[in-house]
């Protein structure tokens, strides 16, 4: 059990590291081939924070462990808001200024509702996967359009912050070096995560869904946590919140879409009856906090969000032995 725990932690750290290096390499390649920096920032870099979830979901799907993938998608969205936004608010109260974010928030809520329509029947079908991946393409086109508009106007706070985060150094040799390293590490790391998560789920008599919701989702959300904390400390509030919005959309359309496309079939009914409702509720709370014009969320909100995370985690593990055979 201790060995499986250690290997799971090492695997998650390697997944996060390899995803970061892949994004770094992709940013250099895009810059080299003349893609505007703002589009790189709003697509490659933003999506990069969700790459660990995507990698784990893909590996779990290939091993027909769809509940682990579904749990990772839902759990990451819950954790991004309750834990990561809560901790960021505790570090420093902040306000969302960007009009781009306010245009993306309704899309995040819409996609969250779509997730319910996919999960409610306890089945993931290949048509569900195709539909979700089609939404992913539409979303990418949407943010590219937003990037081009922001580039012309040049006044949006989010776009200024994203440009500041782009890598400034490195040529093609550096990009290909990190690309190769990332592609070598990724399959090994994801296999470590999936295999040892299964071992621990069996040892503690909890479902793969619960393991995905908690341990895997927390581990794969480390990039969002690092981005949010660093963002609010530097006063880059919009990029901290923007990464959460982008990650939550991406988790539904890609991380949930992959198991539906690769390994369609039955899923744990608790994914809809227990976990989806929590995800939708915290998504609505998140949107309301961002739409407010007064300084928000403050430390009081941070305490409530992190407290909500602890309560959710405790109830999840308390109920799991009763609800899971």
UniProtKB/Swiss-Prot annotation:
It is found in: Cell inner membrane. One of its GO terms (molecular function) is calcium channel activity. Its main location: membrane. Residues 1-5, 59-67, 126, 191-198, 265-269, 324-325 are periplasmic. It is a multi-pass membrane protein. PANTHER family: INNER MEMBRANE PROTEIN YRBG, SODIUM/POTASSIUM/CALCIUM EXCHANGER. This is Inner membrane protein YrbG. It comes from Escherichia coli (strain K12). One of its GO terms (biological process) is intracellular calcium ion homeostasis. It comes from the Bacteria. GO terms for cellular component: plasma membrane. Residues 27-37, 89-104, 148-169, 220-243, 291-302 are cytoplasmic. Keywords: Cell inner membrane, Cell membrane, Membrane, Transmembrane, Transmembrane helix. Gene3D superfamilies: NCX, central ion-binding region. InterPro entries: K/Na/Ca-exchanger, NaCa_Exmemb, NCX_ion-bd_dom_sf. Belongs to the Ca(2+):cation antiporter (CaCA) (TC 2.A.19) family. The chain crosses the membrane at residues 6-26, 38-58, 68-88, 105-125, 127-147, 170-190, 199-219, 244-264, 270-290, 303-323.
